[in-house]
Amino acid sequence: MAEQASSFTDRLAARFAGAQIAVALPRGEVTLEVAAADWHATCLALRDELGFEQLSDLCGVDYLGYGSGEWDTADVSSQGFSRGVEGKAVGRFAWGEFPSQESSAGAQPQQLPKQRFAVVAQLISYQHNQRLRVRCYAPDEQVPLVASVTDIWPGVNWFEREAFDLFGIVFDGHPDLRRILTDYGFVGHPFRKDFPLIGNVEVRYDEERKRVVYEPVTSVEPRVGVPRVIRDDARYETAAGEVGRSETAK
């Protein structure tokens, strides 16, 4: 598997100069990371030149708060979860609030990552018996914009609509970019890490108006139900050691 993956990454490196290529061993999972400006051209080349005729999945990813936890499990804790955990991760707050982090100058707003929103596609080549993960980061966190690939793989239509609905990622050139899971009056994008877990509106039936109404959330108090834990122990040594190769193609 490692030999096959190495040969495949050599082909990718020769074709896509400047792209980031990583291989996870021993499974041989290959990830190709390209700039958002090259997203459409890369996908087209992968289909027409490298035989990736099927896109099996496409999703959005929000890296806000990536790598930060709420409960330290590296040693014996004097503050077990049964004793309460202070919410530090994103999403633990009411609408409009934002998490903070401690620094020498006191509590400061949590820093936004330079590359927050990503689009990830899973491709399959039946003729070469090969799978490939392709990823790009939207250059603008305020308005994450990535080219649509519906003209390359028409089946991606609803996947892109889902990523738009849940993450707010805009796919330029999509023929029908509208919400697909939430209703048309929904405020915000619920899979963003800064979207409050309690939501921002609640729905009830109003007897006087004889219709469903949306109102600001007032009946739910934000709290940590399950702490965000990032474990660093033997169970994750294999996963951490699987990245066998990460290089910049030249």
Curated annotation (Swiss-Prot):
It is found in: Cell inner membrane. Pfam families: Complex1_30kDa. SUPFAM superfamilies: Nqo5-like. One of its GO terms (cellular component) is plasma membrane. It is an enzyme of class 7 (translocase). GO terms for molecular function: NADH dehydrogenase (ubiquinone) activity; NADH:ubiquinone reductase (non-electrogenic) activity; quinone binding. Gene3D superfamilies: NADH:ubiquinone oxidoreductase, 30kDa subunit. HAMAP family: NDH1_NuoC (MF_01357). NDH-1 shuttles electrons from NADH, via FMN and iron-sulfur (Fe-S) centers, to quinones in the respiratory chain. The immediate electron acceptor for the enzyme in this species is believed to be ubiquinone. Couples the redox reaction to proton translocation (for every two electrons transferred, four hydrogen ions are translocated across the cytoplasmic membrane), and thus conserves the redox energy in a proton gradient. This is NADH-quinone oxidoreductase subunit C. It comes from Xanthomonas oryzae pv. oryzae (strain KACC10331 / KXO85).
